[in-house]
């Protein structure tokens, strides 16, 4: 067995593999972003810039069902970036629909879940 470090710019607690063809490794930890490693790309390239991704948590506050331009505070017609308290916790990919679920606010902030 071989262990390899992968550079990331986000917390890497509680890893959970997804159910996709890329064998994506989803991570949770402190910080206001969802982070992942596309292990298929990592295995092929050993390039963290190509294999690692992240995105901030965003609420669909304008209610149109899609990701739009977003800001840090609610604003007419835009979605809103969300900081889940002490950070996301316990990431869990859904086995059939591809959504990614997190719990939030475990130690501080608003309790809830993110999808």
What are these regions (language model features)?
Residues 1, 43-52, 60-80:
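Acidic, glycine-anchored loop motifs typical of Ca2+
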Residues 1, 18-19, 37-38, 43, ...:
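Acidic/polar residues at beta-strand termini and the immediately following turn/coil
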Residues 5-14, 20-22, 27-33, 67-98, ...:
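Signature of short aromatic-glycine-proline-rich micro-motifs recurring in repeat-based ectodomains
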Residues 32-46, 108-115:
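Structural motif
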């Amino acid at each position: 067995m071989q262990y390899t470090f992968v550079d990331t710019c986000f917390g890497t607690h509680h890893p959970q593999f997804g159910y996709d063809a890329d064998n994506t490794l989803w991570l949770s930890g402190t910080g206001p972003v969802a982070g992942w490693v596309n292990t298929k790309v990592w295995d092929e390239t050993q390039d963290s810039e190509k294999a690692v991704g992240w995105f901030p948590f965003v609420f669909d506050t304008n209610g149109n069902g899609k990701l739009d331009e977003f800001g840090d505070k609610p604003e007419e017609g835009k979605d809103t970036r969300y900081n889940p308290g002490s950070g996301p916790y316990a990431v869990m990919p859904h086995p059939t629909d591809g959504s990614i679920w997190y719990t939030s606010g475990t130690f501080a902030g608003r309790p809830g879940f993110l999808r």
